[in-house]
From Swiss-Prot:
Disruption phenotype: Cells lacking this gene show a reduced growth rate, especially at high temperatures. They show a reduced amount of 70S ribosomes engaged in translation and a corresponding increase in the amount of free ribosomal subunits.
Role this protein plays: Required for maturation of 30S ribosomal subunits, probably at a late stage of ribosomal protein binding, while Era is associated and after RimM.
Annotated localization: Cytoplasm
SUPFAM superfamilies in alphabetical order: YhbC-like, C-terminal domain, YhbC-like, N-terminal domain
Organism name: Escherichia coli (strain K12)
Source organism superkingdom: Bacteria
CDD domains: YlxS_C
Protein name, as recorded: Ribosome maturation factor RimP
Sequence similarity: Belongs to the RimP family.
Length: 150
Protein backbone atom coordinates (compact mmCIF):
# COMPACT_ATOMS: atom_id res chain seq x y z
CA UNK A 1 0.00 0.00 0.00
CA UNK A 2 1.41 3.39 -0.98
CA UNK A 3 1.83 6.26 1.48
CA UNK A 4 -1.10 8.07 -0.17
CA UNK A 5 -3.30 4.97 0.12
CA UNK A 6 -2.36 4.63 3.80
CA UNK A 7 -3.20 8.28 4.43
CA UNK A 8 -6.52 7.97 2.58
CA UNK A 9 -7.39 4.80 4.50
CA UNK A 10 -6.78 6.60 7.80
CA UNK A 11 -8.93 9.54 6.68
CA UNK A 12 -11.96 7.61 5.44
CA UNK A 13 -12.16 4.59 7.76
CA UNK A 14 -14.12 6.40 10.50
CA UNK A 15 -16.72 7.96 8.16
CA UNK A 16 -17.28 4.62 6.39
CA UNK A 17 -17.63 2.74 9.69
CA UNK A 18 -19.96 5.45 11.05
CA UNK A 19 -22.34 4.55 8.22
CA UNK A 20 -22.23 0.91 9.35
CA UNK A 21 -19.90 -0.49 6.69
CA UNK A 22 -16.51 -2.16 6.69
CA UNK A 23 -13.80 -0.45 4.65
CA UNK A 24 -12.38 -3.47 2.83
CA UNK A 25 -9.65 -1.44 1.14
CA UNK A 26 -8.79 1.24 -1.36
CA UNK A 27 -6.86 1.52 -4.60
CA UNK A 28 -5.55 4.73 -6.13
CA UNK A 29 -4.83 4.23 -9.81
CA UNK A 30 -2.89 7.02 -11.48
CA UNK A 31 -3.45 7.75 -15.14
CA UNK A 32 -4.79 10.31 -17.57
CA UNK A 33 -7.88 10.22 -15.39
CA UNK A 34 -6.87 8.90 -11.98
CA UNK A 35 -9.30 6.78 -9.97
CA UNK A 36 -9.79 6.37 -6.24
CA UNK A 37 -11.59 3.05 -5.80
CA UNK A 38 -13.08 2.28 -2.38
CA UNK A 39 -14.37 -1.19 -1.50
CA UNK A 40 -17.00 -1.50 1.24
CA UNK A 41 -18.88 -4.43 2.70
CA UNK A 42 -21.38 -5.36 5.39
CA UNK A 43 -22.97 -8.51 6.74
CA UNK A 44 -26.12 -7.69 4.77
CA UNK A 45 -24.25 -7.05 1.53
CA UNK A 46 -24.00 -3.79 -0.41
CA UNK A 47 -26.46 -2.08 -2.74
CA UNK A 48 -26.26 0.99 -4.96
CA UNK A 49 -27.76 3.27 -2.31
CA UNK A 50 -25.08 2.16 0.17
CA UNK A 51 -22.37 3.05 -2.36
CA UNK A 52 -23.98 6.45 -2.97
CA UNK A 53 -24.17 7.19 0.78
CA UNK A 54 -20.50 6.30 1.28
CA UNK A 55 -19.48 8.25 -1.82
CA UNK A 56 -21.28 11.36 -0.53
CA UNK A 57 -19.70 11.07 2.93
CA UNK A 58 -16.18 10.32 1.66
CA UNK A 59 -16.39 13.13 -0.92
CA UNK A 60 -17.13 15.61 1.86
CA UNK A 61 -14.07 14.45 3.84
CA UNK A 62 -11.80 14.51 0.79
CA UNK A 63 -13.03 17.97 -0.24
CA UNK A 64 -12.06 19.37 3.17
CA UNK A 65 -8.75 17.51 3.59
CA UNK A 66 -7.79 17.62 -0.13
CA UNK A 67 -5.05 14.94 0.03
CA UNK A 68 -5.04 14.17 -3.71
CA UNK A 69 -3.30 16.78 -5.86
CA UNK A 70 -4.53 15.53 -9.26
CA UNK A 71 -8.00 15.25 -10.78
CA UNK A 72 -9.59 11.87 -10.05
CA UNK A 73 -12.82 9.91 -10.18
CA UNK A 74 -14.22 8.42 -6.99
CA UNK A 75 -15.67 4.91 -7.25
CA UNK A 76 -17.34 3.10 -4.35
CA UNK A 77 -18.30 -0.56 -4.76
CA UNK A 78 -18.70 -3.91 -3.08
CA UNK A 79 -15.69 -6.22 -3.24
CA UNK A 80 -17.51 -8.44 -5.76
CA UNK A 81 -16.94 -12.13 -6.46
CA UNK A 82 -13.26 -11.58 -7.26
CA UNK A 83 -12.85 -9.82 -3.93
CA UNK A 84 -9.53 -8.01 -3.47
CA UNK A 85 -7.52 -8.93 -0.38
CA UNK A 86 -5.60 -6.18 1.40
CA UNK A 87 -4.78 -7.30 4.95
CA UNK A 88 -3.55 -10.41 6.77
CA UNK A 89 -7.04 -10.64 8.29
CA UNK A 90 -8.55 -10.86 4.80
CA UNK A 91 -6.25 -13.75 3.89
CA UNK A 92 -7.03 -15.52 7.19
CA UNK A 93 -10.77 -15.14 6.56
CA UNK A 94 -10.42 -16.84 3.17
CA UNK A 95 -8.09 -19.75 4.04
CA UNK A 96 -9.02 -22.62 1.72
CA UNK A 97 -10.07 -20.28 -1.11
CA UNK A 98 -8.30 -19.86 -4.44
CA UNK A 99 -6.43 -16.60 -4.97
CA UNK A 100 -4.44 -14.85 -7.70
CA UNK A 101 -1.43 -12.85 -6.52
CA UNK A 102 0.64 -10.25 -8.35
CA UNK A 103 3.93 -9.59 -6.60
CA UNK A 104 5.96 -6.38 -6.44
CA UNK A 105 9.20 -8.35 -6.83
CA UNK A 106 9.44 -11.73 -8.54
CA UNK A 107 9.82 -14.92 -6.53
CA UNK A 108 11.41 -17.77 -8.49
CA UNK A 109 11.32 -15.50 -11.57
CA UNK A 110 7.52 -15.15 -11.34
CA UNK A 111 5.38 -12.18 -10.38
CA UNK A 112 1.96 -13.79 -10.95
CA UNK A 113 0.85 -16.78 -8.86
CA UNK A 114 -2.43 -18.63 -8.44
CA UNK A 115 -3.22 -21.17 -5.74
CA UNK A 116 -5.15 -21.91 -2.57
CA UNK A 117 -4.57 -19.92 0.61
CA UNK A 118 -3.24 -22.42 3.14
CA UNK A 119 -2.17 -20.33 6.13
CA UNK A 120 -1.41 -16.89 7.47
CA UNK A 121 1.40 -16.33 9.96
CA UNK A 122 1.75 -12.68 10.87
CA UNK A 123 2.76 -10.94 7.65
CA UNK A 124 3.53 -14.18 5.77
CA UNK A 125 0.97 -15.88 3.53
CA UNK A 126 1.28 -19.56 2.52
CA UNK A 127 -0.37 -20.47 -0.79
CA UNK A 128 -0.49 -23.99 -2.22
CA UNK A 129 0.45 -23.73 -5.91
CA UNK A 130 0.32 -26.90 -8.01
CA UNK A 131 0.69 -29.06 -4.90
CA UNK A 132 3.64 -27.11 -3.46
CA UNK A 133 3.48 -24.60 -0.60
CA UNK A 134 4.86 -21.16 -1.45
CA UNK A 135 5.33 -18.47 1.19
CA UNK A 136 4.92 -14.78 0.34
CA UNK A 137 5.49 -11.66 2.41
CA UNK A 138 2.35 -9.55 2.55
CA UNK A 139 4.55 -6.50 1.84
CA UNK A 140 5.57 -8.08 -1.50
CA UNK A 141 1.99 -8.61 -2.67
CA UNK A 142 0.98 -5.79 -5.02
CA UNK A 143 -2.48 -7.14 -5.75
CA UNK A 144 -4.50 -10.16 -4.64
CA UNK A 145 -7.97 -11.29 -5.68
CA UNK A 146 -10.11 -14.31 -4.89
CA UNK A 147 -10.83 -16.50 -7.90
CA UNK A 148 -14.60 -16.93 -8.29
CA UNK A 149 -15.95 -20.38 -9.12
CA UNK A 150 -19.29 -20.67 -10.85
Amino acid sequence: MSTLEQKLTEMITAPVEALGFELVGIEFIRGRTSTLRIYIDSEDGINVDDCADVSHQVSAVLDVEDPITVAYNLEVSSPGLDRPLFTAEHYARFVGEEVTLVLRMAVQNRRKWQGVIKAVDGEMITVTVEGKDEVFALSNIQKANLVPHF
